[in-house]
């Protein structure tokens, strides 16, 4: 089962990476929807990373650091793309997605 979670995690990384470097057509009709999407994407990404490693994510500092570094690198790459822009609030939304998962996951796991 861990192999499936790892595959889903890898596919999510590829999808998020592709979406991060692809030009955006027009503006969003809903204000701040991009921040919500950043939050949800990293919440789900953190969930699948947690399922795909043997240790709980809170104990795996390396995995957590990699997620945060990945979020930062996406914004760094976007800074250098003429058709995208790097935003601190996008990075903060990514971090909030990670942190919300880390906060609620242990509570949900122990209740299940």
Tell me the role of every PLM-derived stretch:
Residues 1-51, 63, 67:
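"…centered on the first transmembrane helix and the immediately adjacent amphipathic helix/loop
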Residues 22-23, 54, 82-83:
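Short helix-capping/hinge motifs at transmembrane helix termini and TM-loop junctions
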Residues 57-72:
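Membrane-embedded alpha-helical segments that form the functional core of polytopic membrane enzymes
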Residues 41-55, 97-109:
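Membrane-interfacial alpha-helical segments at the cytosolic side of multi-pass membrane proteins
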Residues 48, 52, 69, 73, ...:
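Residues within alpha-helical transmembrane segments of multi-pass membrane proteins, especially transporters
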Residues 1-22, 89-112:
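Terminal transmembrane helix and immediately flanking juxtamembrane interfaces
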Residues 29-35, 76-96:
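Interfacial helix-loop-helix junctions of multi-pass membrane proteins
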């Amino acid at each position: 089962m861990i192999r499936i979670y790892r595959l889903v995690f890898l596919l999510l990384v590829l999808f998020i990476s592709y979406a991060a470097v692809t030009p955006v057509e027009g503006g969003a009709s809903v204000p701040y929807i991009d921040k919500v999407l950043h939050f949800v994407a990293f919440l789900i990404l953190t969930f699948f990373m947690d399922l795909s490693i043997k240790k709980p994510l809170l104990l795996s500092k390396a995995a957590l650091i990699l997620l945060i570094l990945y979020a930062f690198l996406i914004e760094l790459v976007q800074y250098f793309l003429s058709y995208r822009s790097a935003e601190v609030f996008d990075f903060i939304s990514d971090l909030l997605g990670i942190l919300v998962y880390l906060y609620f996951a242990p509570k949900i796991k122990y209740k299940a």
